[in-house]
Design a protein with these regions (language model features):
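Carbohydrate-interacting regions of secretory-pathway proteins
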Residues: 20-204
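Bacterial Sec-dependent N-terminal signal peptides
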Residues: 1-22
């Protein structure tokens, strides 16, 4: 009986990542479109703003300080889905998956500062760079100056990414940190404006 249950669990995860994305519900919202509930607002916040349409904007300040908006909670296995739009400047952003050390993956949004080209949906590992380019065979998938959907699953040390409904990444990081917060990045040293909306997070 135990073997049957285990096999069912394994097949469930296999089908999840063969057939695609999860269904998120209202209760899974991590951003309510009105407040910073569920998030740790940086001290003297001048970067993160919410407008009347429920859109979260991250805008560089004049000194290009940069900022990260962290979730209050820490997560083990989880899935996050959001929509983003690159508004202005050289956008270098992303989602920190369980922290920002060399044991953590960041899913890139926009231009890589080191590679000087767009690496959206690709994993970035601090001190190691980009081990794989997610959109190498899907260069027309990313919509410039329009809304894009991004869904990321972190299951143990495995990371799965969908951009605009298409599976583009299946990556594993050896010795990955398996618990930590989620962060939205406004990269320092850049002049940029990026927007987010419809953000959901579900523990797995």
């Amino acid at each position: 009986m135990k073997k049957i249950i285990l096999l069912t669990i394994v097949l469930t995860f296999m089908s999840l990542h063969v057939y695609g994305q999860l269904k998120f519900e209202e209760k899974d919202k991590i951003f309510d479109g009105k407040t910073f509930t569920n998030w740790v607002v940086p001290e003297n916040n001048i970067w993160w703003k919410i407008d009347s349409k429920g859109i979260l904007s991250a805008i560089s300040d004049s000194t290009k300080t940069g900022s990260t908006l962290w979730s209050e909670e820490k997560y083990n296995d989880f899935a996050i889905r959001l929509e983003f739009k690159m508004i202005d400047g050289i956008v270098d952003s992303g989602i920190f998956m369980r922290g920002e050390s060399s044991e953590n993956v960041q899913i890139q949004i926009g231009i890589s500062g080191s590679l000087k080209r767009d690496m959206t949906a690709s994993p970035y590992v601090p001190k190691k760079g980009y081990p794989i380019e997610a959109l190498k065979d899907h260069t027309d998938l990313l919509k410039q100056k329009d809304w894009n959907s991004l869904e990321v699953h972190a299951i143990a040390n495995h990371y799965y990414v969908w951009l605009n409904g298409l599976a583009v990444l299946d990556y594993s990081l050896k010795n990955a940190n398996l618990i930590g917060p989620v962060g939205l990045q406004l990269h320092p040293g850049k002049t940029m404006n990026i927007q987010f909306k419809n953000m959901f997070l579900k523990t797995l």
